[in-house]
C-alpha cells in the first residue's frame, strides 16, 4: 500500500486538517500553531499565529478553535484563552504572516469577543460583505445550541437539555433570504426507563435572516428554529441506532437533493450509516405537526424577512416548543446503508453530484484503521482496510483530495497520506482488476490503473 507519513511537532495537538489543493500539501491546525505539511518533498513548516490584540507574551495563552480556508493562501482563524475570543485573517503566502481582521470580518470579531469557543465545535462561515459565523456550543449548560456572530448576533434560547453537536450545513438557496443553516446533534434522553435509548439524534434548522424576536420575547434568540428526530434502524429486526457520531455532506446540483451521510452507534457495540436528503428534512419541517402541541395557527415555517415583527402570541408558541412530531426517515424510507459490529468514529464520503459514479465512503475505526466502502445501486460493502499507523491510534480527522485520490488521516502525533487508488495491488490481469470492484480502478487494456475515461472496460477478453 502506497503511503507517506509526516510527524507533527511534539507540542502540536491537532484541531483540523485543511487541503491546500496542490503539491500534495495540507495545513494541520494545532492548538498554538499551523503546520504546513508537504508530502511531495516530505517537509513541514511551522507557522505561528501572532494574535493582533494581546501583547506578544500573551499569544501563547490563545488556543486555535476555528480555521477556515477562504481563498488561495488566505485563512480565517479564531482563538480563545478561556475568557475571550479573537478572530482574524492570515495570508500564509507572506514571509511573516500577520493576523489582522479584514473589513468584512470586523462584525464577527466585535460580536464574538466575549464568547468562549469550545474545541471541536462545528462551524460555518458565510463569506460576504456582511460576513456571519455560525458556531455551536455543546454540553449540558442552559446556553447550548447554535450561535450567530456578525452584524446581528443571535443566541439559542435557554433550556435544560444536554446536546452535543457533530455537524453544520449551510443551504445554498438562490434567494439569500431563504437560506438556512442545518445542525446535527445528539441529545441525552431524559426518559431513563429500562428500554429507553441513552441518546436521541436530531436535526435542527434556523434561517440566516433571523434577527430574533421582539423585546422581552426571544429578543436576540432564534425565532425560526425547528427540531426533528432522525430515524435510523431496521424496522423488521427492531434494531435501532440513536447515538449520532458524525455527519458529512454530498452536495447536489439541485440543493434539495443534497445528501447527509450520518454515522450512528447503538448500545450493542454496532455502527450504522443512514442517508437523508435536505428535501426530506425540509418536508418534515413544512408539514409535520409540532410535538405535544395543539395546532399552532399563524406560526411561520418559512424564513421571515423581519423576525422582530412577529406577533407576540406567535413568539410565545415558538418559545414553548420547536420539536416536530414526525421523524426524518432515511432516503426512500430505507434502512441503514451500512451496519456492522465495528466501532466507527468518523465518516468522509466521496460522491458525484448526479450519482454518475459509485459513492465511496471512508470510515475510521476506534483502533486507527480506515475502511473503504463502496455503495452501488444494489448494496454496500467494505472493499479495503487501511492501517495508516504503526500502533493503535485515535483518528482526529480524515480528508480526501478527490483529484489525486489521496486520503489524509491525522492522529495526535502524525498525518498520513494514503493512495486510495493504488490499483496495481489488484494484480496484472483484467479479471482480478474487475473483480476488485474498486470504483477508483479500471482496466485500460494492459494493466489495472486509476480510472480514466479510457479505462474501466468491464468486459475482459477471453484468452
What is the predicted function of each stretch?
Residues 434-450:
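Extracellular, cysteine-rich, disulfide-stabilized repeat modules with beta-strand cores
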Residues 424-437:
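Disulfide-braced loops of extracellular cysteine-rich modules
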